[in-house]
């Protein structure tokens, strides 16, 4: 089987708060329903339902600003790892003092 690599000469999609409008859309290959929705988008937006507007947004963007600004739990991993190594160091020091 042949592995197809991505063409890195083309612009890539990225969610960033400091660069809010990426060069390309999040969804590159539209399904039939998404294509129909994109055609419906060309008409009046007042005829679109809220769910259709959200779906159009999700075609263009992966995350909203609220989702990008959401806190992560990465700090728990960092603190846990630091405490683990502090504990190992304490055990080594206690072992050295004992022997």
UniProtKB/Swiss-Prot annotation:
Pfam families: COX4 (PF02936). Keywords: Acetylation, Membrane, Mitochondrion, Mitochondrion inner membrane, Phosphoprotein, Transmembrane, Transmembrane helix. Pathway: Energy metabolism; oxidative phosphorylation. The chain crosses the membrane at residues 74-99. The modification N6-succinyllysine is found at residues 4, 35. It is a single-pass membrane protein. It is found in: Mitochondrion inner membrane. GO terms for biological process: mitochondrial electron transport, cytochrome c to oxygen. The modification Phosphoserine is found at residues 31, 33. One of its GO terms (cellular component) is respiratory chain complex IV. InterPro entries: Cyt_c_oxidase_su4, Cyt_c_oxidase_su4_fam, Cyt_c_oxidase_su4_sf. The modification N6-acetyllysine is found at residues 4, 28, 35, 42. Residues 1-73 are mitochondrial matrix. It comes from the Eukaryota. Component of the cytochrome c oxidase (complex IV, CIV), a multisubunit enzyme composed of 14 subunits. The complex is composed of a catalytic core of 3 subunits MT-CO1, MT-CO2 and MT-CO3, encoded in the mitochondrial DNA, and 11 supernumerary subunits COX4I, COX5A, COX5B, COX6A, COX6B, COX6C, COX7A, COX7B, COX7C, COX8 and NDUFA4, which are encoded in the nuclear genome. Belongs to the cytochrome c oxidase IV family. Component of the cytochrome c oxidase, the last enzyme in the mitochondrial electron transport chain which drives oxidative phosphorylation. The respiratory chain contains 3 multisubunit complexes succinate dehydrogenase (complex II, CII), ubiquinol-cytochrome c oxidoreductase (cytochrome b-c1 complex, complex III, CIII) and cytochrome c oxidase (complex IV, CIV), that cooperate to transfer electrons derived from NADH and succinate to molecular oxygen, creating an electrochemical gradient over the inner membrane that drives transmembrane transport and the ATP synthase. This is Cytochrome c oxidase subunit 4 isoform 1, mitochondrial. It comes from Mandrillus sphinx (Mandrill). The gene is COX4I1.
């Amino acid at each position: 089987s042949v592995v197809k690599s991505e063409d890195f000469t083309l612009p890539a999609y990225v969610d960033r708060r400091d660069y809010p409008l990426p060069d390309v859309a999040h969804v590159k290959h539209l399904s039939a329903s998404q294509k129909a929705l994109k055609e419906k988008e060309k008409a009046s937006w007042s005829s679109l339902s809220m769910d259709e507007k959200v779906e159009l947004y999700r075609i263009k963007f992966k995350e909203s600003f609220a989702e990008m600004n959401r806190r992560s739990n990465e700090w728990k991993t960092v603190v846990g790892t630091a405490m683990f190594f502090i504990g190992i160091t304490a055990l080594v020091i206690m072992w050295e003092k004992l022997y």
